[in-house]
Amino acid sequence: MEVEARLRKIFSGAKIDLLLIKNGSEQDPNFKYLTGFTSGTFEDNFLIASRKKVSVLTSELEYETALSQAKEGIEVFNVLGSKKNFKKAISVIKGKSIGVNGNFLSFNDYNKIKKFKPSKIIDISKNLTKARLVKSAEEIANIRRAVSITKFAIMEVQKSIKAGMTELEVAAQVDFVMKSLGASGNSFDTIVAFGKNTALPHHMPDQTKLNDGDLVLIDTGAKYNNYCADITRTFVYGKSNKRAEEMIKFVKSVQLMAIHMLKPGVDAYIVGKKVKKYIDSYKGGIYKGKFIHALGHGIGLEAHDASVFGNTPYRKIKKGMTLAVEPGIYFVGFGGVRIEDDVLIDKNGAIVL
């Protein structure tokens, strides 16, 4: 991991002297991006970065953990246990123009930072998002591994599920297999839905039992070295279900069409609109209005790394981006189908990871 290269990407176009990242009960993903730390929680820790180096302000609790992982360009200071030492360490921001992540920083932490008298506090969340859009070879390798673990886990569980199992049992199996294959955790809580529940895109697994002929939807993602996968599979369990099988076949074809359209220079937002129009017009409109979410999103340190397919500043596709592509159709009272894969944008188009 080249710390200085990542700092150059963040500071490019940002009119700031220093970057300040403040973790809360969870880590700001940009803390992970700049440190590469894969162990430790670093709750309420600070990161202060110049254009050349990163300083982590931590406590006795995390000091050795941070020190053992610090690469070239990263300094670690054990100062959070002492008000005097902390004030001395953070005094570097006094009179300086400070960039912060406005998408993560709490109002209380913003006010705490103001007390140390920076000349300006500027929200550079767009710079941070932009810096992380195009992935390095190391990042791509981590995402590829996370995807591989996720796909294998879903396949293994699909072979072992039986009628009478609950959604919660299947979700637990998926999580167990991913961990046993080396995942450090989940990108998000695993979604498992049976039957009518598959019509709810973000259904959380419950005690619903699997019946013969049910639609089964599994949406999950392993995390590997901080990097996420996001994969969804929908299938019919047991006896044939013609309507459900036709829906699955259609959604798979739509996903292939969408992936084929993703190339450097293409507007992802327009691709999403074209896909929606196609779904709405298919066979006289039998699926009209049933595609109720975006075509996909960025994937990386977060399961939803950036709204590439939305009407956002990040919609122009670039080589090196990693994206999740997830068309779906949903019928309340019957069920839904979503197929999701993660792709890497190469110079010639999208490669399914």
Placement of each model-derived feature along the sequence:
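Active-site neighborhoods and metal-handling regions in enzymes and metal-associated proteins
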Residues: 1-353
